[in-house]
A protein has these predicted regions:
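N-terminal periplasmic/intermembrane-space "pro-region" immediately following the signal or transit peptide
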Residues: 1-77, 84
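Short, structured coil/loop segments at alpha-helix boundaries
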Residues: 3, 34-39, 112, 233, ...
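Outer-membrane beta-barrel pore domains
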Residues: 9-15, 79-95, 129-135, 148, ...
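Outer membrane beta-barrel
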Residues: 15-18, 69, 75-78, 94-204, ...
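Charged interaction patches that mediate protein-protein contacts
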Residues: 50-73, 226, 231, 235-243, ...
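Short, low-complexity, polar/charged sequence segments that are solvent-exposed and flexible
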Residues: 93, 173-177, 208-209, 342-346
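Outer-membrane pore/translocation modules
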Residues: 198-228, 238-260, 265
């Protein structure tokens, strides 16, 4: 039970202090499966060295308080994007080539047993290889507090926000506001806040009608959303939700309405540990014909996506890899800021096939290639 000094010796010919003896007793107290006789001896020793054990505990606690309670993670990312667009006016193709470099830091600060503070700090640079222009930005992309009480999670501040029911098809970006998620196996999500449209690129459109701007909303809009979905780790996943974005002045001018209401649903199935299939659908309501947009076709009011996944590269596992193939139709008015825009090449108002391949050539390094047509 008594381990001595850890080097195989007990140094019986040397005197030890009561604190050294208390350390040995503390190690003995932490052991399990000791006999009744040994347990009685340990209890007597603990009573004898109670003051030293107490003082030793105070010293350890004091050291723990001095340990930095902020943990840092981060990444460095390079992207090359080649985008070829048909110019319908002169029947020519326009090629755009962009280099993007991103340095990201993500600190997490422990506040107490229930709350932590989180942030995401981005420093990025983008070079347009066609025009020679260069853009550099440094932003605090997220800053918020997160509370956990049992199976309830609360996020408040400039938070990450993803529509889980449809695997991020409607939205996967950020919002200034709050979100509460209840439950474990089946979850209920309630979210509300404000969306900075100029940065968020809400309802991204390429201008489907004469007179439209590149992005429908330029001012801050209010957002409310509710979703019910099951745990994403289950074999069969499902979810449904309702999202509302409201901006009276601009929406009134664009389509003679004051808000866009989006109903979203998603289904997924894991055939095995390596193969899974997901699908999602969203429909926008509350939109009228009129205003700058004129008559709005149904294709702009609904979105759908389906994707087949095989494995997936993991940064912690060198040599791991994965692939996917999917088809998406993203209506401008039924996607707020889709995950296929945030992590892929697709904007609102576009549809097509996408394939991708990911690979981890070494630990903590992942490469990914995506092609869309």
């Amino acid at each position: 039970v008594i381990e001595g000094y850890g080097d195989g010796t007990y140094r019986g010919d040397q005197e030890i202090t009561r604190y050294e003896m208390a350390q040995m007793v503390a190690r003995a107290m932490a052991k399990s499966g000791v006999s009744g006789a040994d347990k009685a001896m340990i209890d007597r020793l603990a009573a004898e060295f109670a003051d030293e054990l107490n003082n030793l505990g105070v010293r350890v606690a004091a050291l723990e308080k001095k340990v930095d309670n902020v943990k840092w993670t981060g990444r460095v990312r390079y992207r090359y994007i080649h985008r070829s667009e048909d110019n319908m006016s002169d029947h020519e193709k326009e090629n755009k080539n962009t280099n993007q470099v991103l340095f990201r830091l993500e600190p997490t600060a422990r506040i107490n047993e229930n709350w932590v503070g989180k942030a995401r700090i981005d420093y990025g640079q983008a070079d347009n290889m066609n025009t020679g222009s260069n853009e550099t930005s440094a932003t605090v992309d997220r800053i918020y507090v997160e509370g956990t009480y049992g199976t309830t999670k609360i996020d408040l501040g400039k938070i990450p926000f993803k529509t889980q029911a449809d695997y991020g098809m409607v939205s996967d970006y950020r919002m200034a506001g709050g979100q509460v998620v209840f439950g474990k196996d089946v979850k209920l999500s309630l979210a509300a806040g404000r969306i900075n449209d100029d940065n968020y690129k809400v309802f991204a459109t390429g201008g489907t009608n004469a007179g439209t701007t590149d992005y429908i909303l330029k001012k801050t809009a209010s957002y409310q959303g509710v979703e019910v979905y099951n745990d994403r780790a289950q074999k069969f996943t499902w979810g449904l939700g309702f999202q509302r974005v409201k901006q009276e002045a601009e929406m009134k001018a664009l389509f003679d309405g004051t808000e866009v209401n989006i109903w979203n649903v998603g289904l997924g199935y894991k055939f095995s540990q390596d193969v899974s299939l997901t699908g999602a659908y969203a429909q926008a309501t509350g939109i009228n014909d009129g205003g700058i947009l004129g008559k709005i076709d149904s294709k702009h009011k609904h979105s759908y996506a389906v994707q087949l996944n095989y494995k997936g590269a993991k940064a912690s596992q060198m040599g791991s890899w994965g692939a996917f193939v999917g088809y998406r139709h993203l209506g401008e008015l039924s996607t707020i800021h889709s995950t296929y825009r945030e992590f892929g090449p697709m904007n609102g108002g576009e549809k097509g096939w996408e394939v991708g391949l990911s690979w981890a050539p070494m630990k903590n390094v992942v490469g990914k290639v995506q092609y869309y047509w």
